[in-house]
């Protein structure tokens, strides 16, 4: 069956960040698209306005008359639409397989990694847009100042974020693959086996054609080992001075950072200015720089992009300046939900605001991750002045480990840290009004529905 022979494509979980861009591409190419999700959101509303038939709630009737059903990694095998598609012998594929089909005919770039892939993909997309290459891109977050998470361009490049959480990125067939880092996340899928995680990343990179390029950060031991093992053409980057491209002379300012990228083979130095803060974002920019260079984009265009990049939604995003009982505070929102990401957030905020206290409102994400990385989370949260811990966001998991947010609070209090549990917005506000003394930073941190809390705090205190 050819893709051109397909009439109706149905998406289970169509409102998810990884699904909406693919669905939009298919609509723009003339396919009849339908999809279901548990709740209406901005993505489902947008797709409906473009012509997709949207169902709220999952029902076996929704997949009838479909030629193909696409599901995301968040969809459980017990989903009634999954079951119906199987019983009706409808072709059932993961989102990455559909994305792989769409990548054919493009010069494609895929960005993978445990952390930083959304920002890196966004930086690459912004550079290619400014270079007037009119790329198509599908990103797991929204570039601030831009309406959509996906754009269907007319150029030859397709830039995508690759999902390693369930190894579905192995379906992809890019010509340039980026790995920002490899860390101990999604180990529930990888059977708590880090070697299996490493080998899956290696397989992703080995899938490159012989004329392709792998771009890999070697600052972590795991990604460095994968780089050394890889047989495909490869380029390394990082703060490590042995990397093919390394960063030096990083200077953090209040609203931007400056650094140099050195090409090891020639010693050539490029001075860059980036609107994003934090060492982790300098690394993300280095990856984007190398990809843009591989595409032959002028250095001036790259510099212009970095200097004017608007940022990515929920990645150290400035929300508002607040007044809480007359005391000033700055509200920041961040998607990070792994200890490495929390550490990067805290370090970035401290480097730009060395004299301000930090209050982190943290919503742990998944019982499995909270249990496995509990000690690492506590080590990170010790570095903020006040922690407000919300209920763990289950993301559909059962609490087999019997872990509670009180475990976080009690562990922090044992370490003489200022920590609280909050059940709801009212309790959060009560704590903020008691604890915020003025000239502080409040960070809403997590991958669940904490963005709603952030928006509510903004509405109350702005």
Regions found by a protein language model. Give the residues of each.
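Nucleotide phosphate-binding/pyrophosphate-handling subdomain across enzymes
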Residues: 2-10, 18, 22-29, 176, ...
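P-loop/Walker A phosphate-binding loop and immediately adjacent motor/lid segment at beta-alpha junctions
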Residues: 81-91, 207-212, 232, 344-353, ...
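Beta-strand->loop->alpha-helix junctions that form or flank phosphate-binding loops
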Residues: 36-37, 55-58, 93-97, 138-139, ...
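Phosphate-binding loop of NTP-binding sites
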Residues: 2, 25-31, 48, 61-64, ...
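NAD(P)-binding Rossmann-fold cofactor-contacting core
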Residues: 32-46
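Conserved beta-strand positions in the Rossmann-like core of class I SAM-dependent methyltransferases
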Residues: 34-35, 136, 388
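Conserved N-terminal Rossmann-fold NAD(P)-binding element of oxidoreductases
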Residues: 9-14, 445
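C-terminal helical cap/extension that packs against the catalytic core
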Residues: 59, 378-438
């Amino acid at each position: 069956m050819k893709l051109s022979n397909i009439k109706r494509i149905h998406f289970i979980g169509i409102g998810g960040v990884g699904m909406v861009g693919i669905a939009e591409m298919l609509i723009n190419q003339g396919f009849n698209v339908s999809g279901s999700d548990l709740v209406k959101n901005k993505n489902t509303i947008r797709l409906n306005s473009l012509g997709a038939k949207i169902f709220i709630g999952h029902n076996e009737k929704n997949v009838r008359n479909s030629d193909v059903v696409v599901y995301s990694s968040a969809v459980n095998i017990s989903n009634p639409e999954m079951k119906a598609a199987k019983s009706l012998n409808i072709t059932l594929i993961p989102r990455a397989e559909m994305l792989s089909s769409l990548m054919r005919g493009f010069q494609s770039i895929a960005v993978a990694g445990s952390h930083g892939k959304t920002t890196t993909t966004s930086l690459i997309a912004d550079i290619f847009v400014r270079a007037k290459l009119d790329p198509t891109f599908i990103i797991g977050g929204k570039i601030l100042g831009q309406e959509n998470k996906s754009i269907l361009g007319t150029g030859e490049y397709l830039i995508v974020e690759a999902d390693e959480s369930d190894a579905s990125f192995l379906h992809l067939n890019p010509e340039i693959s980026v790995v920002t880092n490899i860390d101990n996340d999604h180990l529930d899928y990888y059977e708590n086996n880090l070697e299996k995680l490493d080998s899956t990343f290696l397989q992703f990179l080995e899938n490159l054609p012989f004329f392709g390029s792998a771009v890999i950060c070697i600052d972590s031991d795991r990604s460095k080992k994968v780089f050394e093992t890889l047989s495909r053409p490869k380029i390394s980057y990082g703060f490590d001075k042995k990397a093919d491209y390394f960063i030096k002379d990083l200077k953090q300012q209040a609203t931007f950072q400056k650094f140099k990228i050195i090409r090891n083979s020639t010693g050539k130095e490029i001075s860059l200015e980036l609107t994003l803060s934090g060492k982790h974002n300098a690394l993300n920019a280095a990856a984007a720089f190398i990809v843009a260079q591989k595409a032959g984009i002028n250095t001036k265009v790259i510099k212009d992009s970095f200097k004017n990049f608007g940022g990515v939604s929920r990645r150290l995003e400035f929300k508002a300046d607040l007044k809480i009982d007359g005391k000033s505070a700055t509200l920041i929102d961040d998607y990070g939900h792994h200890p490495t990401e929390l550490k990067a957030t805290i370090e970035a905020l401290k480097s730009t605001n060395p004299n301000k206290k930090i209050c982190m409102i943290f919503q742990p994400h998944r019982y499995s991750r909270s249990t496995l990385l509990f000690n690492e989370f506590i080590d990170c949260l010790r570095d903020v002045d006040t922690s407000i811990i919300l209920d763990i966001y289950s993301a559909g998991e059962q609490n087999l480990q019997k872990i509670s947010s009180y475990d976080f609070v009690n562990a922090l209090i044992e370490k003489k840290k200022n920590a609280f549990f909050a059940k709801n917005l009212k309790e959060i506000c009560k704590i903020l009004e008691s604890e915020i003394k003025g000239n502080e930073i409040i960070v809403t941190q997590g991958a669940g529905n904490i963005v709603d809390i952030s928006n509510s705090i903004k509405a109350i205190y702005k």
